[in-house]
Amino acid sequence: NIAPKGIEFGLGGFYTYADNDYKMKSPFQEGLTITRDHDKFKKTVIGGSFKARKWWFDLVEFEPVFIHTYKDIQGIESNIRHAHSHSNAFIFANKMEKENFLLDGLDLDWQLGYIYTDYHFADTASHRTHWDGTHYPAVSEFGGEIGKWASLLTNEKHQLQHKLNLNYLVNENHSVNFNSLLKYAHANPRDGMKDKVIGYRTDFPSNMFSWVAGLNYDYRTSNDKFLNSFNVKYYYYSMKTRMASVLVKTAEDIDTHKNDFGISNALRYRITPSLMAKASFGYDVRLPSEEELLGDGYVIAPAGNLTPERNISVNIGMLFDLTGKASSNLQIELNGYYMHLKDMIRFTGGFLQSQYQNFGEMRTLGMEAEVKADMTRWLYGYVNATYQDLRDVRKYEQNTTVANPTKGSRMPNIPLSLIHI
């Protein structure tokens, strides 16, 4: 540290190594004891930090980070012996903060991040191995232990993310906030071995850009009895790539540009100093993430034609709060909520590759109760009970005019009720 100049330096890192071999009885062959190995894992992380607190900005921070990861692929049903992956990530982050930026009452928070990753997956073994050690043919004439083809994948990604938050305090009753989140991602997957097996190229470069901008206005009374927060958002995203299936040779050009608006309002009213009522409603949009759109180049196929999720929601609740007013710091909260989600994005498995897809419409009705308290000076108690009824409300099967046979049915693999203690 250089304290008089407000400058701090930092350097750190860690190394992780795991290689846990163990024996177990085979669930596939009676009387056979197998050794589970090929699960080596290595990770190296090195990072640095530079902070300046006495420049024109209140805080200027730079952080470079390097991450290297190696992982053996361990089979569950099959005895994978050679397939493995490794990756390198180079990360650079910059953050700047300034109170009273350009004018009194205006606070700035700026964040910029760049990530470069190169991911490699190798599955070119000349044969597969049974649990008893005997060999049998690879998945293709070019080798491979997993899936339906050999693979020698390289996937390079460039990601750029920028966050900006400007908060302006007009006076004790009014404040305005502007926030912006911009993301850009470029992926370039290449797998010549897979192309050899299939006979044509299925992985192509992709470019994704998204921007979410929001403007928020808060009004609160001088006695803090009433607070209202009104928010509007603008959403934009574009995706340019080519998509080809491992089953269809022809590649489809994808050049998507979509935009939308969102609006929400939340309010709360203090009935007593410890009891408040709250409510909110909104129309929100969730843009597809970089992982959902670009996939990983191997197990997860790109989904450049995804549509943003759109959600209408209503929430009503009560909060009884004794935090700082009693030794128990008791909090009791009750909420009821309704959501209608369109174009829900979900992960769907496939015979050869999995992919994220738009599902359709889903309606949610729910209630939630939560109690938190300090039971003693050293014991904290927490219990949460949730009831959630999620229903498929699609009229038709996805992208067809065929009536949906599961309309009105509960969504699978989502619990109707749950309790956390």
Give short role names for the model-derived ranges.
Residues Q331-I332, G336-H340, Q357-L418:
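Gram-negative outer-membrane beta-barrel transporters
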Residues F50-H68, S87-L247, E252-S264, R268-T272, ...:
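Face-selective signature of the C-terminal outer-membrane beta-barrel domain
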Residues A18-N20, R270, K278-G282, P308-L365, ...:
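Membrane-embedded beta-barrel scaffold of Gram-negative outer-membrane proteins
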Residues N1, K40-I46, H86-F92, E156-L160, ...:
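Residues that define the transmembrane beta-barrel architecture of outer-membrane proteins
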Residues Y22-Q29, E63-I67, D72-I80, H120-T129, ...:
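Outer-membrane beta-barrel translocator domains and adjoining extracellular loop/strand segments
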Residues N1-A83, P405:
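Periplasmic-side early beta-strands and strand-to-turn transitions of outer-membrane beta-barrels
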Residues G31-R36, Q74-H84, E97, I146-L152, ...:
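Extracellular loop and loop/strand-boundary signature of outer-membrane beta-barrel proteins
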